[in-house]
A protein has these predicted regions:
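Interfacial segments at transmembrane-helix termini and the short loops linking adjacent helices
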Residues: 26, 124-144, 272, 278, ...
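Hydrophobic alpha-helical transmembrane segments
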Residues: 138-142, 171-222, 400-406, 419-440, ...
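Helix-loop junctions and terminal segments of transmembrane helices
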Residues: 78-94, 163, 287-329, 383-388
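Membrane-proximal transmembrane or re-entrant/amphipathic helices at the cytosolic face
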Residues: 2-19, 465-515
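Alpha-helical transmembrane segments of polytopic membrane transporters and translocases
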Residues: 49, 61-78, 107, 247, ...
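Transmembrane helical elements of multi-pass membrane transporters/channels
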Residues: 28-45, 177, 202-214, 218, ...
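Membrane-interface junctions at transmembrane-helix termini in multi-pass inner-membrane proteins
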Residues: 150-174, 367-401, 443
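Signature of the first transmembrane helix
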Residues: 3-13, 22-83, 114-121, 147, ...
């Protein structure tokens, strides 16, 4: 039996209407995000290639471990409160209490960040051993603590404006961050020294620049938010917000541990000397340059569609949420595997010329890296259904189980197989997590039609080689276009309507579509 919600309902304001700031629709948001993300990803791709080209494997591995720490520490220090904006900004806006909501969460995040940064600075030798396997990098840890402030401010801004459905501004901020990181990082590497320290400084500076730009823009948005008609009591506010944020923190931590646990296992449990272990992490990093770009796009898309799906969910259109998310997963999942196949075709050129042949270990594990990153990207998309249903704890269960599998298999496979063992362990763990999330969704009524199931099972074909993978994709595409199982007629009509809408805006296409 469903338990009643102990939190008293907050009345919806009668005259809230549409927000006074610009709101982008879901279809427009996807096109804006994809366009800007394409430019951003090109900049990020070139930056990553040049980092791999000019940093030796050990320094590249040290930067990978430093970034992994920031990935874990950023949500942990603020208890993932900004991550819940996508679910609750619209909720409190409709009740005329958005200003109170933002003020409370902002002040809380500032206090938590100050405390977390202080702890890192005071314990920097211990953190150095944890991150790099040696206490001798305490100076780098101090730089990481300073950079953490800028990273949290940047992430806060991205989550807030995404929740406000201002996708144009979010895309601009992400582009500014990516370009600034590339320019400053490459400038420091070429003009100062080719080390992980240069990259850490550049990343912190890039996040600070984007956060300052967001703060300037937020000052105008704040004035357009009406003061609350009546105060929001702290107890009902936190009673509704805190449980979801708490489970979201667990999901974020488990998801981020998925991203870093194999590298930490390499550093601490591979039985290699520290320098050799970091060099293996550098090899691993080279194999993840393009796969992680795809995961980043998936995370952006997943974060972007959350407020739109939440809006439909709040309006009672829950069946529509499932069907929209299923179609999105089919299209994005197919694109993931298609892009991964192209990466395999181009991999000899990438590793032989662009990376100067320094990362043969990364080339050897590339098919497996592409496979598990594709599955992880799908997790970033489908978990939105659990978030809308306020069942974030089920994501925690799935990721926690996968994490245990990852650690256990790493302990078994890492000593005899080295880097390949770590990648195989992570691939299995991602499959376990995705399978559990799909099981939970099926029990909640998510539409797992044949098309969804086929897309979920596509990534392993990458391990059979690029030409076999391409042949499988051709068959799947033909069935989707002409058959009856992978796409329904309604879904094909929806895709065609979307194509006509956006291609019709291009010069020369309008006459074709209207003829």
């Amino acid at each position: 039996m469903t338990q009643p919600d102990p939190t008293p309902p907050i009345p919806i304001a009668d005259d809230v209407g549409d927000p006074p700031w610009r709101v982008d629709g879901l279809a427009d948001s996807v096109m804006i995000l994809l366009t800007m993300a394409a430019v951003q990803r090109i900049a990020g791709f070139l930056r990553a290639i040049l980092f791999c080209r000019w940093l030796d494997p050990e320094q590249l591995g040290q930067w990978d471990m430093a970034f992994s720490f920031l990935l874990l520490a950023a949500p942990l220090t603020v208890l993932a409160l900004p991550g819940a904006f996508g679910r609750y900004v619209e909720h409190f806006r409709q009740r005329g209490q958005l200003r109170t909501f933002l003020r409370s969460t902002t002040l809380t995040c500032i206090g938590l960040l100050a405390a977390g940064t202080t702890v890192i600075l005071l314990g920097r030798r211990w953190f150095s051993g944890l991150i790099f396997g040696t206490p001798d990098e305490s100076g780098t840890v101090a730089l990481l603590a300073v950079s953490l402030v800028a990273v949290v401010a940047y992430n806060f801004s991205i989550e807030l404006f995404t929740a406000l459905r201002n996708v144009r501004l979010v895309s601009v901020l992400q582009l500014v961050n990516s370009v600034a990181f590339a320019v400053i990082g490459l400038g420091l590497i070429l003009g100062w020294r080719a080390s992980a320290v240069s990259v850490v400084i550049a990343y912190g500076a890039a996040c600070l620049i984007a956060a300052l730009l967001a703060g300037w823009r937020l000052s105008g948005t704040w004035q357009s938010i009406r003061p609350a008609a009546e105060p929001l009591a702290a107890r009902p506010f936190w009673a509704r917000f805190a449980p979801f944020a708490g489970w979201l923190l667990m999901v974020n931590m488990l998801a981020n541990l998925f991203e870093v646990i194999d590298r930490y296992m390499i550093v601490h449990y591979s039985t290699m000397p520290t320098s050799e272990a970091l060099a293996q992490v550098g090899n691993y990093h080279s194999s993840r340059v393009i796969p992680m770009l795809m995961v980043t796009v998936a995370a952006m898309l997943g974060s972007m569609i959350t407020p739109h799906l939440s809006h439909d969910w709040e309006a009672g259109r829950r069946r529509e949420v499932g069907h929209r998310l299923a179609l999105f997963l089919k299209l994005f999942g197919f694109a993931l595997v298609l892009g991964s196949t192209a990466v395999l075709v181009a991999s000899p050129l990438l590793f032989g010329w662009a990376f100067r042949g320094k990362f043969d270990g990364g080339l050897a594990v590339l098919p497996w890296t592409l496979t598990y990153c594709s599955w992880f990207a799908m997790v970033m998309i489908v978990q939105n259904y659990l978030w809308c249903a306020e069942k974030a704890y089920l994501c925690s269960v799935a990721l926690g189980t996968g994490l245990v599998v990852n650690i256990g298999l790493n302990l078994l496979l890492l000593p005899p197989l080295g880097l390949l063992g770590a990648v195989l362990a992570t691939t299995t763990a991602n499959l376990v997590a995705l399978g559990l999330i799909c099981l939970f969704l099926a029990r909640m009524g998510f539409p797992f039609d044949p098309g969804v199931r086929v897309v979920l099972g596509l990534p392993p074909v990458l391990c059979l080689g690029p030409w076999i993978a391409m042949s499988v994709l051709v068959v799947v595409a033909a069935e989707a276009a002409l058959g009856k199982h992978l796409l329904t007629p309604e879904e094909r009509d929806e895709i065609a309507a979307g194509a006509r809408k956006y291609l019709g805006r291009l010069p020369g296409f309008h006459r074709v579509w209207t003829a």
